[in-house]
Amino acid sequence: MGMSATMGDSASIPGVFFADFGPAPPEITPEGYHEVELNKTKWVLPQWYNSLKPLGEGAYGVVCTAEYEPTGDRVAIKKFFRPFQSTIHAKRTYRELKLLRTLQHDNVLEMIDVFTPDPDASSLNNVYFVSVLMGSDLQNIMKIQRLTDEQIQLLIYQVLRGLKYIHSAGIIHRDLKPSNIAVNERCEVKVFLSFSQLSFLILSFFKILDFGLARAQDAEMTGYVATRWYRAPEIMLNWMHYTQTVDVWSVGCILAELVSGRPLFPGDDHIDQLTKIMSVVGTPKEEFWSKIQSEEARNYIKNRSPIIRQDFVTLFPMASPYALELLEMMLILDPDRRISVSSALRHDYLREYSVPNDEPVAMDTVINSIVTIDPAEERATTLSDWRELIWNEIRLFQNSARRLSFVSCTDTEEEPMKI
């Protein structure tokens, strides 16, 4: 009775169709697959994925680790929660799959496999993504040890290198934080794309792309999307438009935490966050006020007593001169004056690791795949339509050379930098 009422209320949303979760799953495990129950969740996987262990759970799926039997490598597998609960859920699953199938970069966490145990598009109800399993994330590493300046340089360089690729594809990350930066013991970095937080910078393309909270550049952009401590102030100040430099601010916050050993702006709420930011970078000048769309935020800043920008040498006594200089350029309140990712990659602080001719950007085919809305997607209105689209994406990836083409981190001749 309660469920009927809920479904009835939900079904009143215009243009959104809810499902009965599709046909019942087959009682017999498909040939070539095996069934595992983990934390009360049923996993049906190809037989080459074994030794499952729980890893985490998010809003849209649950993640475990598994051993890929042919190589012995550990991988991470994400099972989507009810991807066909509604057309909104199905669309999100489709676009995440399409995006991850398209992006490919050393410093961006990639999808290496996707599968379903379901036999055809009409019965599609289960979707699994597979990625390389990195040893840890930056948040956990910072909890247990202080990194050397050399390690910090290498980490920040790789994060910026990944961002250069992401930005070139027309994407703003918006959720960059230590827990979204995967790191292995060789100090190799992969940026995790928190899909629902991405924003898409699509020039001359005015259609809103509904990737969760993601929007086209020329549509109004929503605030409050990133984790607060690493969130650029222009997002909190509710500007109509913001740019890729929101990610540079986040990198600056991460760099500051790496050199000082503590979060730079640990705000308790949005007002406290803004107060902490201005206590370090100072209150903005009057010409900056006109850029703030929110009247409440504008009045809040106007009515504050002027604060002088802190001396970063005093604030970060353990930081090298070049690290301080880069921090000064990243942590600027006005995004129009903030250093870009490309310029940051050329900064003297990262000189030892900088290889300008080995900083790939997205190819036109990648950009076109992200920008272009497939006519079939435009026509998709029912869950059956979305099942067909997702089924085709799964088959496209499974027929690609990239499937399970990952290389073990141990297959290298270079001496590792230990963390």
From Swiss-Prot:
Enumerate the catalysed reactions: L-seryl-[protein] + ATP = O-phospho-L-seryl-[protein] + ADP + H(+); L-threonyl-[protein] + ATP = O-phospho-L-threonyl-[protein] + ADP + H(+)
Question: Any idea which residues are catalytic in this one?
Answer: 210 (proton acceptor)
Q: Which InterPro entries does the annotation name?
A: Kinase-like_dom_sf (IPR011009), MAP_kinase (IPR050117), MAP_kinase_CS (IPR003527), MAPK_p38-like (IPR008352), Prot_kinase_dom (IPR000719), Protein_kinase_ATP_BS (IPR017441)
Q: Which residues carry this modification: Phosphothreonine?
A: 222
Q: Which UniProt keywords apply?
A: ATP-binding, Cytoplasm, Kinase, Nucleotide-binding, Phosphoprotein, Serine/threonine-protein kinase, Transferase
Q: What does its activity-regulation comment describe?
A: Activated by phosphorylation on threonine and tyrosine. Inhibited by pyridinyl-imidazole related compounds.
EC number(s) reported in the record = 2.7.11.24
Mind listing the GO molecular function terms for this protein? Answer: ATP binding; MAP kinase activity; protein serine kinase activity; protein serine/threonine kinase activity
Domain named Protein kinase is located at: 49-350
The record lists its disulfide bonds as none
Residues engaged in binding ATP: 55-63, 78
Transmembrane regions: none
Q: What does this protein do?
A: Responds to activation by environmental stress and pro-inflammatory cytokines by phosphorylating downstream targets.
Q: Which family does it belong to?
A: Belongs to the protein kinase superfamily. CMGC Ser/Thr protein kinase family. MAP kinase subfamily.
Protein's recorded name: Mitogen-activated protein kinase pmk-2
The uppermost taxa in this organism's lineage are:
Eukaryota, Metazoa, Ecdysozoa, Nematoda, Chromadorea
Annotated gene = pmk-2
